[in-house]
Structures are given as structure tokens and as C-alpha cells.
Amino acid sequence: MRTFALLTAMLLLVALQPQAEARQARADEAAAQQQPGADDQGMAHSFTRPENAALPLSESAKGLRCVCRRGVCQLL
């Protein structure tokens, strides 16, 4: 009886192993997509104001840049 239970448990472990590996691979992919890193730098957008713009800027506002990443914009 113990041998049968042991063999059944081993068979279940062998049968479920590929499913566990597939889930782990999907979880690793999702984690890699969510982590900021070098990929975010490739998606960054930068906007600068041309010198001959219609509205003049004050001296303190000249040279400002807007850098946007994933919906978050910062003035530099």
C-alpha cells in the first residue's frame, strides 16, 4: 500500500512539473517587463523649446526641457 501511494505521488509530481515550469517562466517574463531599466531609456521622450518660439520665455525658464517616461513628465 505504501509503495502504491509513493508511486502515485511521484507520478503526480512528474505530471505537474511542466505546468509549474511554464507558470514560473510567465512570472519571470512579467517581472522583467515591469522592472525599469535600460528599456525605459529607449522609450524616453524629450522636448525642448526652440529659441524662435512665438511666446518669449523669462530668463529663468530658458533652457528647460521636459522628459517624459511612462506617463510621468519632469522638467529639467
From Swiss-Prot:
**Position(s) of the covalent cross-link Cyclopeptide (Arg-Cys) (interchain with C-73 in subunit B)?**
R65
Site of the Cyclopeptide (Arg-Cys) (interchain with C-73 in subunit A) crosslink? R65
Source organism superkingdom: Eukaryota
Sorted alphabetically, which Pfam families does this protein's record hold?
A: Defensin_propep
- Name the InterPro entries for this protein: Alpha-defensin (IPR016327), Alpha-defensin_N (IPR002366)
SMART domains associated with the record: Defensin_propep
In chain numbering, cross-link Cyclopeptide (Cys-Arg) (interchain with R-65 in subunit A) is at C73
Q: Where would I find the Cyclopeptide (Cys-Arg) (interchain with R-65 in subunit B) crosslink on this chain?
A: C73
Residue span of region Disordered: 24-54
For this UniProt record, the keywords arranged alphabetically read as follows:
Antibiotic, Antimicrobial, Defensin, Disulfide bond, Fungicide, Signal
Q: Where is the composition biased (Low complexity)?
A: 30-44
Could you give a single Gene Ontology term from the biological process aspect?
defense response to Gram-negative bacterium
Which residues pair up as cystines? C68-C73
GO cellular component, alphabetical, reads: extracellular matrix; extracellular space
Q: How is it modified after translation?
A: Forms a cyclic peptide with subunit A (BTD-1), or subunit B (BTD-2). An additional intersubunit disulfide bond is formed.
Q: Which residues form the propeptide?
A: 23-64, 74-76
Q: Where is the signal peptide?
A: 1-22
Role summary: BTD-1 and BTD-2 have antimicrobial activity against the Gram-negative bacterium E.coli ML35, the Gram-positive bacterium S.aureus 502a, and the fungus C.albicans 16820. BTD-2 is more effective against E.coli than BTD-1.
Protein family per UniProt: Belongs to the alpha-defensin family. Theta subfamily.
Could you describe the subunit structure of this protein?
BTD-1 is a cyclic heterodimer composed of subunits A and B; disulfide-linked. BTD-2 is a cyclic homodimer composed of two subunits B; disulfide-linked.
Q: What is this protein called?
A: Theta defensin subunit B
